Amino acid sequence: MDADYIVSGAASCVAMIGHDYDHLFAEDPEWLERSRRVGKRVIDLTTFLDRVARLPAGCLDAGPFHPVTYHHFCQSHNVLKIREEPKRLITEVMGMELREMNEASTCCGFGGSVSIDHPSMAKHIVERKLANIDDTGAPLVITDNPGCILHLRGSVDASGRTVRVLHVAELVDERLRQLTDPA
């Protein structure tokens, strides 16, 4: 493969490929080397847009938009150390108001199989996350992991809330559509 980067919209996959494949292939030198070559090129979408594409300030500013809050997916925050990139993308590149959420990097309750294996615990965790989202007053939650999106959307729907939950890529898409078709 000749690509410089392998961009993923799932930060959990980036963490797995970039950090855990060494353990999986430790007994097989050929596959270990292959996994390391891939691991060096895999990057999450938010980091790619921030560090590689280097989108200039305001290039996705399509005018007024609802304030947003950001849920830091556990592995994005703790393993990949993605902290400031989403904030810059939202505030500087898109020109949006970011309302910081209490416990933004605390698990939403999805946690891989936690929501399946321990549903009552997952429900308690997501209720706390939803309360923190409510406290921001933002009608839109952005995150970078499909598992969190699935769990948060389901919990928002079940609770009757009207908050929208979007992946970073979905937000970028909305802003691009607003720029190309402002009507």
What are the functions of these language-model segments?
Residues 1-183:
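Iron-sulfur cluster-binding electron-transfer modules in prokaryotic oxidoreductases
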